[in-house]
Amino acid sequence: FREIYSRYDNCVAAFMSHFTLWSMCAEQKEEFTIFEHDAIIVNDIPEYLPYKEVCSLGKPSYGKWNDPKTFGVNPLTSKRYFPGAHAYRLRPTGAEKLIEQAKIYAKPTDVYLHLDTFPLLQEYYPWPVEARDTFTTIQKTEGCLAKHNYNEEYKII
């Protein structure tokens, strides 16, 4: 968690909120769809998605990315890690894997969800969810510069 882009305590707190939902998903043995506060649904999300364990629903919210080549569920293509953890769906088996790995090490949630650690990560395209953030409680200025919504009115709280 110690990196130049985020404030340590806030970043850990955000990760733990996701971790808590992963734990609930695993314990309840139910599929979960997780949204962060800035997630806006811009297109229909199919009730049934033929994904394996963890599937991003969110359009990349920072930096450069690659568009998946086909519509529907694809291997994670936009980046090597989730392009923001603002919207994703997971099955209990995926939640269990995320929890087990977090016992070994953890990082900011989006970069924690990385293909090198979790090769079955997928994403749904076209992305039905976008992050429309106007503030952050997690990032430092360095972490905001690549955000697509970052401008002079963006607040670092």
Where are these regions (language model features)?
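An acidic/histidine-cluster motif and surrounding catalytic segment
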Residues: 1-35, 39-157
